[in-house]
Structure formats: C-alpha cells, structure tokens
Amino acid sequence: MSKLKDNPDNSLNDRLNREKAIELARVQIEKDFGKGSLIKMGESPVGKGIESISSGSILLDEAIGVGGYPRGRIIEIFGPESSGKTTLTLQAIAEVQKNGGIAAFIDAEHALDPAYAKALGVNIDELWISQPDTGEQALEIAEYLIRSGGVDLIVVDSVAALTPQAEIDGEMGDSQIGLQARLMSKALRKITGILSKSNTCIMFINQLRMKIGVMFGNPETTTGGNALKFYSSLRLEVRKIDQVTGSSADDIVGNKIRIKVVKNKVAPPFRKVELVIYFGKGISREASILDASVKYNLIQKTGSWYSMGDDKLGQGREHAVSYLVKEKEVTDELESKLRKIIFEDPNQDFLEVGTT
C-alpha cells in the first residue's frame, strides 16, 4: 500500500483498473437482474433527498424532521386506546388528497367512521377502502396497491386486528403462538423492497399490550412481534396527557396529546411535540401554526396577549387561534414563513442517521 501511495501513477492505474472491473461487473449484473440494479447513490432517488407527506401539523412535521411522513417508508403509530392514532392517519390522508394524491385505508378493525373522516377533511368519495377478513388478505391487498405505483399513502388499521387465517379456522381455545408475528415478518420482508420503488408511504396503526411478569423496566409492548419495529423507518408513540375544556370545566372539547418520535431513520430521533385534538375536528392547523409562530418569534406573546407586530390577535390562546381561523391569508403567510425557517435552513442535514 505504501508503494502505491508513493507513486501517483501506480495509484491512478490501480484506480482505473478497479473502475473497469466494477463496470464489467455492473454490465453482468444488469444483464442478469435488469437495468438499474447497480447504480451510484448520487444517480438514484435515494441520494436526492427525502420526499414527504405533511402530517397536517407544522409542529409534528418539524419533530419528524423532513417536513412530514417520509415517502417510500414504513411508519408505525402506536399508543393506548383513544389517544389519537387514527386521527393522525386520517389527517395525513386529507393532506394527500389536498395535494391531488391518492390514498387507501385498509380497515382490518371494520371500525372506520365516514362522518368523522369527512369532518377531518377526507374526501370519502375518493378514498379507497378495504375491509379484509384475514390478516393475509389485508397484507396482500397492501402489496398489490404498493406494486401498482398509483397510491401515495396506505393506512392499515390496525396490526392487532390482522388475524391469521389459521386462527380464524381454528377453535376459540386453540393455542396459536407466534402466528401473527410470522405473518408480519413475512409480509414486511416483501413490502420493504417494493416500497421505495413505488414511493408509497404505508402507515401501520398499532396497539399496546402489557408483558406479564415484568418487574423492572417498561412492561408495555406493541402487538405483531418485532418485525414492524425493525422495518419501520419512523415510529411515533402517541399518548393522551390532558383534556381540553371549553366554556366550563365540564365542557370537554378535546384532548391534549404528546407524540414522541421513538425511532427515526430520516432525521434525529427522540423529539417530542404536544398537540390538541378537538372532538369532531381533529388536530387544529391554526393552533399548531400559532405555537410554532410563537416559538420562532413571528408572533409575540406578552402575558396572555398574542400580537403580530402592532396587530393584536387576541387575549388568551383560544382567541388567538380563532383569529387565525378567520384570517386565512394571515395563517397561510405564517405557515409559508415557518416552512422556510424550519425546512429550508441550509444548516439542517436530513441524511439518514438512524439504525435498525
């Protein structure tokens, strides 16, 4: 090696010889496996940044790190019951449709409420929906949709409801250990390879279970084995932390939730964000923009008053949010400024940093 370093001509010749050898190998690889089987990373879509789907909240988009849910990836959203998991996915569907995209909802729980989806901005006339009978059926439908290349977002609700065919055919008391975990492992191995080529984003909603006999550490775990944890590029933990009251203490108008990015392969992980989900309305876009604007000093908060320059928006958070709801042009302008500040900062590096 030292001789090669001492002689630049030898080093250059060695480099050229190795490049010729790689080129011959590339030709053979493309002959056997098809064009594009081996390319330099700078020539591939992987090396050109990560496309994303907005979550509907600029605060959550910031926490994820790439402006929303990454395309061509597997995403897991998990948490306790009634914490807002389905609401997050429906808002993502609404954002996809708003931008002219196509979304599909695989309703394994058979519990999707069309009225609620419509209230969150989902165009139910354009939403593709499937209510499969078995887990195998659900995951095969997802695979077909991904292979089609025509769907931007697929939501599977939920992993816990993906019941294997053998379990359905068996008796109620039969022991079926590991069936669902094997089903998920096999399906995800197939799905992962084709996702990036189709640029489809697939979101799995998952539930929490308690591990029996755990004395130390967190006894909570998600259903469906470990495969989804490994294959997911993004895992979001959603928890309800408080209730939001209206005009009186008995008037509960929504829930305050905390979302933690527990795994992230497209940006730094472990970020947290708190959002408000209003009953029948979902996550308030205006409330997220207000909080982000205060954070980046586009809106000033003095005591309980919110102001923007010389203009007062209102006293108290709810009045300031109401102002932004009415003044759509102001809200759009604030969002545009925030996205430039957060996502177009040249100092931010969104290369893959996570590990499996």
Curated annotation (Swiss-Prot):
One of its GO terms (cellular component) is cytosol. GO terms for molecular function: ATP binding; ATP hydrolysis activity; ATP-dependent DNA damage sensor activity; damaged DNA binding; single-stranded DNA binding. SUPFAM superfamilies: P-loop containing nucleoside triphosphate hydrolases (SSF52540), RecA protein, C-terminal domain (SSF54752). Disulfide bonds: none annotated. One of its GO terms (biological process) is SOS response. This is Protein RecA. Keywords: ATP-binding, Cytoplasm, DNA damage, DNA recombination, DNA repair, DNA-binding, Nucleotide-binding, SOS response. PROSITE patterns: RECA_1, RECA_2, RECA_3. It is found in: Cytoplasm. It holds the Pfam family RecA_C. SMART domains: AAA. Can catalyze the hydrolysis of ATP in the presence of single-stranded DNA, the ATP-dependent uptake of single-stranded DNA by duplex DNA, and the ATP-dependent hybridization of homologous single-stranded DNAs. It interacts with LexA causing its activation and leading to its autocatalytic cleavage.
